[in-house]
Amino acid sequence: MENLDALVSQALEAVQSAEDINALEQIRVHYLGKKGELTQVMKTLGNLPAEERPHVGALINVAKERVTEVLNARKASFEQAELTAKLAAECIDVTLPGRGQTSGGLHPITRTLERIEQFFTHIGYGIAEGPEVEDDYHNFEALNIPGHHPARSMHDTFYFNANMLLRTHTSPVQVRTMESQQPPIRIVCPGRVYRSDSDITHSPMFHQIEGLLVDRDINFADLKGTIEEFLRVFFEKELAVRFRPSYFPFTEPSAEVDMECVMCSGKGCRVCKQTGWLEVMGCGMVHPNVLRMSGIDPEEFQGFAFGMGVERLAMLRYGVNDLRLFFDNDLRFLAQFR
């Protein structure tokens, strides 16, 4: 038993002198492992008389428990010290300024669309939408566009087959609305449209918004007043507006709308090509054939329609000279519109 006491004292001294958890583990294996010194003492019980084995075995177990207890306590102190050091190293200084967050913003095209929609919904128009993949009838036939019209050319329109295509305007939404609703109808139709064209002022995909009003006793003066008021509100200034006679298959009479150049106030500049005027939209009274093909009696109801390119208005409002900037996803450009 003197050897046992000496072995325990030796083990406890080793535990206290250990400098880290790895050293403790080596001490545990040396004294308490399968081939450890205290374990080997337990194996000598077989050499003792039977009557002494219980007593000696109990003493050995007490010795092992004592060493284990001290070893675990020492290990816990190391772990606590390690945790304390780690927390100190990772301490967050709450007095430091936080990391700034960059706030997002609406895309200028989205801003422009919302501004247009807001004006028309405030004066009683609804928002109508339709498919971007359209059939030939709704994109052309129902709008009084004959088969020989240049717009049907493969050079201007993206066809899937002889009957299906990417819509070239949002006018098909007007046709579908007239087919499904009875007058009075007051709608604007925003959406993406597709034409085979690409340069600094054109894109193969762009946004268009068209308007339609169908009711009794509607005339060109109603159309003129609506457009003039829209341009005044959209650009937030009084602008001279003129209507030039034009031709569209789906309206009669038809007109192109020019407004006083917002860049030079009509004095003449590079943007307006020294004319003082900017073309902003097309419009006209809905052709009787279009009303008739949509199931509306042109003798009882009249209507007007107009259409404008959203990118065109955004370029004029924000002073952007290259349409492609809207689609380059350059944050340096887009950040200006927050």
Curated annotation (Swiss-Prot):
Any one GO molecular function term: magnesium ion binding
Q: What's the main place this protein lives?
A: cytoplasm
Which cell locations does it reside in? Cytoplasm
| The protein's required cofactors | Mg(2+)
Magnesium recorded as keyword: yes
The record lists Mg(2+) as bound by E252
Fetch the PROSITE patterns from UniProt. Answer: AA_TRNA_LIGASE_II
Is the Nucleotide-binding keyword given for this protein?
Answer: yes
Q: How does it assemble?
A: Tetramer of two alpha and two beta subunits.
Name the record gives this protein: Phenylalanine--tRNA ligase alpha subunit
Gene, per the UniProt record: pheS
